[in-house]
Amino acid sequence: VLSYWDFVTQDAIDAIYQGEFPGWAVEHGGVLETSLMLHLHPHLVEMEKVCDHAPAEFPPYDFFPIKPEWTPASGCLSSAKRASAEHGETLLKVCVDGISHELATAFD
């Protein structure tokens, strides 16, 4: 099973986030995934509706049931306000290169 995030390099994270990466735990629907959508399917993204808030904070362990106050009212765990098609293009290239390399290595 391949997941795109397994192939995102630290250099790509640094270039996209400029040292402000909130972490993978709160990235779902954040800058990276929204940037990919802006690059691949911009007509499906309504950036004017993106909330701008601090990333959600969770304890470093699983807790059930999850406390509703841990999730921002928007339902988004981090803001996608800094997303761009350019970031999406960078991310797609890094992931395609990484996945292609691994598949070529595995099936060579």
Residue positions per predicted region:
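Extended, histidine- and acidic-residue-enriched regions that form the cofactor-binding/catalytic faces
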Residues: 1-108
